[in-house]
Amino acid sequence: MAATLGQVLALVLVAALWGGTQPLLKRASSRLQQVHERTWARQLLQEMKTLFLNPEYLMPFSLNQCGSLLYYLTLASTDLTLAVPISNSLAIIFTLIVGKVLGEDIGGKRAFAGMVLTVAGITLCITSSVTKTQGQPSAL
């Protein structure tokens, strides 16, 4: 089953939402204070309260969950052999890009080479799957 351009764009958006929010979630959760309660249930409730009342954590978490919802909806009409590589591989790329923008060390030239190779592989995957016109698969 070939994918439409809209499906591919939806999967790229999923990757952007997943990957782009990971460094923000990491940053927000590292700044939280540690909570200590006597029972595991109270500990869990206190940790959830601390997380979900923190807008710095809640905004990227909400965007990340929107990505999951979009992924679920897109899977209804997209081939898994296309959906999984696009969303998961590109999510890593978006994580590295956003991490770099936020000042994290992403690994230098080898990380950049890995990103280029990943994008090249995903491009080949998309090119072989997207239909340019109705009923005609694209030529590679």
Swiss-Prot record:
The keyword Flavoprotein does not apply. The chain crosses the membrane at residues 1-21, 82-102, 111-131. GO terms for cellular component: membrane. It is found in: Membrane. It comes from the Eukaryota. The keyword DNA damage does not apply. Keywords: Membrane, Transmembrane, Transmembrane helix. InterPro entries: TMEM234. It holds the Pfam family TMEM234. It is a multi-pass membrane protein. PANTHER family: TRANSMEMBRANE PROTEIN 234. Belongs to the TMEM234 family. This is Transmembrane protein 234. It comes from Bos taurus. The gene is TMEM234.
